[in-house]
Amino acid sequence: TRERLRQTGFAAAERLVQQLIHDRQYESAIPVCQAILAHDRAWEPAYRQLMQIYSAVGNRPQVVNSYNRCVAALREELDVEPSEETEALLNRLTS
């Protein structure tokens, strides 16, 4: 189905971002995350990846900004709060 293909594409993009993060190619990883979010504002894993990227380059304000954008998107699109995984990542990256 179309939804399954979309999710498969997002999963492939997430794997690409993880590889780029592993290779410390942070500037290349950011647009991939942004492309995912352009198609689905509430795709929480992309926000977590952005948080990891911004933390890796020492940009703590963007870590928090990415989290806040995630919270807003999840509330507006799905009426839910971020997952425990996202909350734990924020705490780990900002403590």
Residue spans for each PLM region:
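Intrinsically disordered, charged and Pro/Gly-enriched terminal/linker segments
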Residues: T1-S95
